[in-house]
Regions:
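Conserved small-residue-rich
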Residues: 159-223, 304-337, 370-408
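C-terminal interaction surface of TIR/SEFIR-family domains
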Residues: 1-33, 57, 78-81, 107-186, ...
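Acidic/glycine-enriched connector segments
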Residues: 29-41, 52-63, 68-72, 76-86, ...
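Residue-level detector of buried hydrophobic side-chain packing
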Residues: 106, 163, 194, 220-221, ...
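Polyanion-binding and phosphate-handling cores
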Residues: 175-199, 206-292
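Conserved beta-strand-loop-alpha-helix hinge of the TIR/SEFIR fold
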Residues: 16-17, 52-53, 61-112, 168-169, ...
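A short acidic (Asp/Glu
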Residues: 20-25, 83-86, 115-117, 173-176, ...
Length: 641
């Protein structure tokens, strides 16, 4: 099922801008996901970056990846002085601007506004020409606001914040905070308006209808003070907002005990006021952007589903019309815990599934604890596709996360280089163990600490540096580690002490020992949880360096040839560049892209049961995980049957 994304964001900066990579990484975590915490909630908005690295020519920003495209140009002194960047912006970038493409710029230099008169007509964010990282909170506010209005599903040109608060606290604590927030919105020039009942209700108008109508259309901040849950109008306001699927957050500021917490204030983001309203407003805007984006994304799924753009609760279920209560329900990632879902299903009479988009795509998938190998490394050309390290980490960990959720296991081979994928996958295995405990509830095995979700093959001589502390960490994270033997060039003494010889001999020994590891991975048998050992279910390739660090050929290419020799089902995700892209181009017989020494094959020889031409095209070229992952999951499920 092809899913058109509602929005993609593209960051453009000069290669000499020192904070460019950091800004991109922060934006990726802010708008998409934090790949180091894959089971946490994210907004799912893909973020790409574009720069002039390696003096490659600047290419047009791809606007066919999503329904709308937001382009953010970081204009620093280096870009201001660059003739190439100026010509690119004027002759290429600005000509792409249309209703579905919005361009904004950030002034990082005092003369940035002079960079291009044509660009000057676009919106500029300015923060006193100082480091963007020093003004990150204010930048978040402005970016969130722009993205919400760009998506604009409610037809609003200005966001209005409804400040829901109690006036009955001791010393009017909640009311004073509400007034302080109102004044902040007025004085800081946030371009956000507020609904504050003392000032916003027109004289002579119906009090109740004005409040409820405003709650219908605004985004809401709840000032949760000690008397909030006991005030009738506070309850009316929040129920009205939730009934109409409005974004709501809570700000906790309690001075004393609470007799009762109103139960239907749950399942919303919350924070604590710490004498600064900027983080509070940013949490509300992030929540609003997330719900806006999710409404558009979920609308791409079949119409015979109930869809909510937030984590569902009992009040949400009560608002579903009777005629729709037999429909399955779709809500955003990440999945709710087992116990929470059980409560919701019981309320609904256990009639329907309540699931996330990825669970919907894999709802009938069961890999029967078969093992799937992943081959991945960074590539030299990933920047040419706008792909940063955060995106590569993200797509890989999302793929593995859903394989684990579909009752599969992971196999990976590495050399424990600093910042390598081995340790990231180890951390994922640990987090999945925690998630599985919540997700399965009473179905959790009697001895969950004995479960293993991943097998890590570590080549000689790299495993010689692993101490007992590291081994304990792998065990704690439910990872089996397999220390591979060295190649036949290595003597028994050298196998214990480490690689010896000339530089050329050392490289050759490492290269051949990596080959031994790859052959071990491919030929080993893996437990499927039924006391029966089976071969790998399949292997997935992503990225990969195009030049080997040790041997005569890139590691990804060698692993591909070994898998091909064993007739292993293979998935090539070519959209992320690297050696995987080169293999895809070789199969497609792209002129000038042939790989010397690699035999010519057809896609059907990958044995992955993906036969539809459109799906082959997606796997070969797409970076959209909502397209890629369901195709891979369905194919793996067919192979596992």
């Amino acid at each position: 099922m092809a899913i058109e994304l509602p929005l993609t964001v593209h960051i453009l900066y000069h290669k000499e801008y020192k904070e460019g990579a950091k800004v991109y990484s922060n934006l990726y975590k802010m708008l998409c996901r934090d790949s180091h915490n894959p089971f946490a909630s994210g907004l799912d908005i893909p973020v790409y970056f574009h720069t002039d690295e390696n003096d490659t020519s600047l290419q047009p920003v791809p606007t066919n990846l999503s329904a709308k495209t937001f382009i953010l140009i970081l204009v620093d002194q280096n870009m201001y002085l660059s003739k190439e960047w100026k010509e690119y912006v004027i002759n290429t970038l600005l000509k792409q601007q249309k209703d579905t493409v919005q361009i904004c710029a950030v002034s990082l230099y005092k003369y940035a506004f002079e960079f291009s008169s044509e660009l000057g007509a676009c919106q500029f964010f300015s923060f006193g020409n100082e480091s963007l990282l020093l003004h990150w909170g204010e930048f978040q506010t402005r970016l969130y606001d722009n993205l919400i209005r760009f998506l604009n599903i409610d037809g609003l040109n200005q966001l209005r914040i409804f400040i829901s608060h109690s006036k009955r606290d001791i010393c009017s604590h909640g009311e004073r905070l509400a007034k302080d927030l109102r004044d902040y919105l007025l004085q800081r020039g946030t371009k956000l308006s507020s609904f504050f009942d003392v000032n916003s209700i027109m004289e002579g108008g119906d009090f109740e209808s004005q409040i409820l109508e405003s709650a219908d259309k605004a985004i809401m901040i709840v000032i949760f003070s000690e008397t909030y849950s006991s005030r009738e109008w506070c309850i009316k306001e929040i129920l009205q907002a939730k009934k109409n699927n409005r974004p709501v957050i809570a700000v906790f500021d309690i001075d004393g005990d609470i007799d009762r917490v109103f139960p239907y204030i749950g399942n919303i983001p919350a924070t604590i006021y710490k004498n600064d309203w900027t983080p509070v407003v940013n949490l509300l805007l992030r929540t609003t952007l997330g719900m806006t984006y999710q409404k558009l994304l979920l609308s791409k799924f079949p119409d015979d589903l109930n869809k909510v753009a937030f984590a569902p609760d009992a009040y949400c279920l009560s608002n579903i019309p009777a005629e729709n209560r037999n429909k399955e329900m779709l809500y955003p990632e990440p999945p709710l815990s087992y116990d929470e879902l059980e409560i919701l299903k019981n309320i609904n009479g256990n009639k329907v599934n309540i699931m996330t988009p990825m669970q919907f795509n894999a709802k009938d998938c069961n890999f029967k604890q078969r093992s799937v190998a992943i081959s991945i490394s960074e590539s030299e050309d990933q920047h040419q596709n706008g792909i940063g390290q955060d995106m590569l980490d993200d797509v890989t960990l999302e793929m593995l996360r859903h394989i684990l959720i579909a009752n599969g296991k992971i196999v990976y081979g590495g050399n424990l280089q600093q910042d390598g994928f081995t340790e990231r996958f180890r951390d994922l295995s640990f987090q999945y163990g925690q998630y599985r405990h919540l997700a399965l509830g009473k179905q959790e095995p009697n001895n969950p600490e004995d479960e293993r979700y991943m097998t890590a093959f570590i080549a000689w001589p790299f495993h010689l540096t692993i101490d007992n502390d590291q081994r304990s960490e792998f065990k704690h994270c439910r990872v089996d580690i397999h220390f591979c033997k060295p190649c036949d060039m290595v003597s028994p003494e050298e196998a214990k002490s480490g690689v010896e010889g000339t530089d050329a001999e050392k490289r050759e020994k490492r290269a051949r020992s990596l080959t031994v590891m790859r052959e071990d991975m491919e030929s080993s048998k893996y437990s499927d949880g039924t006391n029966e050992d089976k071969e790998l279910l399949a292997r997935i390739f992503i990225g990969g360096k195009t030049v080997s660090s040790y041997g005569s050929k890139p590691g990804i290419l060698e692993e591909f040839e070994i898998s091909l020799k064993h007739n292993r089902p293979i998935f090539l995700l070519g959209g992320f560049g690297g050696e995987t892209r080169r293999i895809v181009d070789h199969i497609n017989k792209v002129p000038g892209k042939e790989i010397v020494g690699l035999k010519q094959i057809e896609f059907k020889e990958l044995n992955n049961q993906v036969t539809d031409k459109n799906e082959i095209e997606v796997l070969s070229n797409s970076t959209n995980i909502f397209e890629i992952i369901p195709i891979v999951l369905r194919a793996l499920n067919n192979i596992a049957k």
